[in-house]
């Protein structure tokens, strides 16, 4: 199974990108959750606007699905400027970046998603652009080649990444503002579900919103995806209104349990507990036992189970915790 097949995947599909655009908050006042980030960005943006300057370059990092792209667009809206959007893998050559930079208006936002995937050649062009608002361009080839400097308007680079540790130090050090997005609380997700339902014209009560929120793995993107699927269920099996009971039945049908685990999570935990006596078990043996690739287990399944305290990664292998045994109603071996 691949990540995109899972309803609780935090990664967006192309269809979801366009669907989510309609329900994304446009202003900080509509942005739910991340109170520290929201408070800080409000101060930084108001200060920059008061000085009539471009906002400092901003790095946003954290797990997928938490709203990095949304926050980048909010920054542009609050600064009342345009935003140009691209991603690290798309910028293959220095010329690709130069074309974007030379088309920016003063104070505009350039948003680079997956910025950790920029090539070294593109990064070299980015350094003087970020630091001095200058673009170094080579004209000609061989002995006749010469470098010219182009002045750029002051702009704001907003970089987003799920893997901040892969950023080079010179690039990371050039960001004046660094924000980490954390997983959302159930209460914040409940507000997000209720807001999205209102924008989508879906009838939902507090119980229904709470049921979806608590199974959304702390991730707004998953919450909005589950809301759409529960809406489908409500329209066919109920009267179109989402209550706690309707949400519970719909999510059970979708194999998403009370902790937001799907069949893949449960299969891994049960394999550790039942086939390997709770562990420790090596990831290769575990992969063979459940018929998944080692990389899928390490990158897709394990992180959330470890973060929630159901699985431990030790030098000797994976170990199921007491919480895992409690979840399945099993007795932990002595």
From Swiss-Prot:
It catalyses: ATP + H2O = ADP + phosphate + H(+). Keywords: ATP-binding, Cytoplasm, DNA damage, DNA recombination, DNA repair, DNA-binding, Hydrolase, Nucleotide-binding. GO terms for molecular function: ATP binding; ATP hydrolysis activity; four-way junction DNA binding; four-way junction helicase activity. Belongs to the RuvB family. ATP binds at residues 23-24, 65, 68-70, 131-133, 174, 184, 221. DNA binds at residues 313, 318. It comes from the Bacteria. Mg(2+) binds at residue 69. Its EC number is 3.6.4.-. Coiled coil: none annotated. It holds the Pfam family RuvB_C. It comes from Hahella chejuensis (strain KCTC 2396). PANTHER family: HOLLIDAY JUNCTION BRANCH MIGRATION COMPLEX SUBUNIT RUVB, PTHR42848. This is Holliday junction branch migration complex subunit RuvB. One of its GO terms (biological process) is DNA repair. GO terms for cellular component: cytoplasm; Holliday junction resolvase complex.
């Amino acid at each position: 199974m691949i990540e995109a097949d899972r309803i609780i995947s935090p990664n967006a599909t192309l269809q979801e990108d366009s669907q989510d655009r309609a329900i994304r908050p446009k202003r900080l006042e509509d942005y739910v959750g991340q109170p520290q980030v929201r408070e800080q960005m409000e101060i930084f943006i108001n200060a920059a606007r008061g000085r009539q300057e471009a906002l400092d370059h901003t790095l946003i990092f954290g797990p997928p699905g938490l709203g990095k792209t949304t926050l980048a667009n909010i920054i542009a809206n609050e600064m009342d400027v345009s935003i140009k959007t691209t991603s690290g893998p798309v910028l293959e050559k220095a010329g690709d970046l130069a074309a974007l930079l030379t088309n920016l208006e003063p104070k505009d936002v350039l948003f680079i998603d997956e910025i950790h995937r920029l090539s070294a050649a593109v990064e070299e062009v980015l350094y003087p652009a970020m630091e001095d608002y200058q673009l170094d361009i080579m004209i000609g080839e061989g002995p006749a080649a010469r470098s010219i400097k182009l002045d750029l308007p002051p702009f704001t680079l907003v970089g987003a990444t799920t893997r901040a540790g892969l950023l080079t130090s010179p690039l990371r050090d050039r960001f004046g503002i660094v924000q980490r997005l954390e997983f959302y609380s159930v209460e914040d997700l409940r507000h997000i579900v209720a807001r999205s339902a209102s924008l989508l014209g879906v009838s939902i009560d507090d119980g229904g919103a709470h049921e979806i929120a608590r199974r959304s793995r702390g991730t707004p993107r998953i919450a909005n995806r589950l809301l759409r699927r529960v809406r489908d269920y409500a329209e066919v099996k109920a009267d179109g209104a989402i209550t706690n009971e309707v949400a519970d039945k719909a999510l059970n049908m979708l194999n998403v349990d009370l902790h937001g685990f799907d069949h893949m999570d449960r299969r891994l935990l049960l394999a550790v507990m039942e086939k390997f006596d709770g562990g420790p078990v090596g990831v290769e043996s575990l992969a063979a036992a459940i018929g998944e690739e080692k990389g899928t287990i390490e990158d897709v399944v394990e992180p959330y189970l470890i973060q929630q305290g159901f699985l431990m990664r030790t030098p000797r292998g994976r170990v199921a915790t007491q919480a895992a045994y409690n979840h399945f109603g099993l007795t932990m071996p002595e």
